[in-house]
Amino acid sequence: MDSFAGKLAVVTGGGSGMGRELVSKLAAQGCGVAACDVRQAAAEETAALARAVAPDGTRVTAHACDVADAAQVARFRDEALAAHGDGNHVDLVFSNAGTGGAGSFINDPPEMWERVFAVDFWGVYHCARVFLPLLMKSTEGVLVNTSSVNGFWASLGAGIPHTAYSAAKFAVKGFSEALIEDLRISAPHVRVVLVMPGHVATNIVTNSLIAFGVPEKDAMEAGQGFYDTAPLSASGAADVILDGVRSGAWRILVGEDAHRLDQYVRAYPEDAYDYEKMSAVLSGSLAEDPARFGAQWFDEDTPRPGQAS
């Protein structure tokens, strides 16, 4: 896809973070966008920001939708088509909506765990189920599913359980990769793109806590540390994603931490839950002193075992 101009995109979780940035950046390039969020006001705010940077004639609409609810996703589809007047196709679907929480399968309430999994996996599934027929009517449809580095490393570090989110993101990764072959056979003009962000400055922690009933002030204080320590902005992440989609990539790692984790886990799967080593990977110190951990080929320029130099 050489250009987003004149296309129609759907973005879930468009009320903040990467979703908001995707909406604005797509609109700025002349792409019509239907943005949804579980919070109507947040989606409306995003749409207003996007319209301010969009060329004349570019339509951006806001919709309320809980992606965990299949009926709401179907309603969102109908509203988007009606609002954009195209009637029969969508060119891009960004399944970006997500939530956190329910880290412990043992200690957290089952309903909280199931809610996180429902948003983070079933939300992606529902969007694929509802929008794929419309993507198939596009000349070059693209389904962009957001997983996470937690889709290949189910941890936040030692002593921090992270089961619901990680399980869902692993499921998104597997589902997306399986769809690649399915579509190659059944709809070869439609692409699936798997996005795996690392630590990005978004309000997912704050929004997730508020959704589970934590007072807003407390949620904002708890989420501020996550936001402030992120090495990559939501705007920077959206740029990486859109560049990857435009270039034809099927797998997009977002952030240097994502690249480091992916490289190390692939090279040393048995070390994935050795927290001394993984902490070094995340901090970047392993790349500085790989021999300390026996990672002789952590640097991409170093030949791997069995690889010619």
Describe the predicted segments one by one.
Residues 104-105, 112-114:
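Substrate-binding pocket helix/loop in short-chain dehydrogenase/reductase
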Residues 29-45:
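Conserved glycine-rich Rossmann-like NAD(P)H-binding loop of the short-chain dehydrogenase/reductase
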Residues 148:
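Residue(s) in the substrate-gating loop at a strand-loop-helix junction
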Residues 2-34:
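Canonical Rossmann dinucleotide-binding motif of NAD(H)/NADP(H)-dependent dehydrogenases/reductases
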Residues 185-257:
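SDR active-site lid
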Residues 40-41, 64-76, 110:
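The beta1-alpha1 cofactor-binding region of Rossmann-like NAD(H)/NADP(H)-dependent oxidoreductases
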Residues 128, 164, 168:
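Active-site helix of classical SDR
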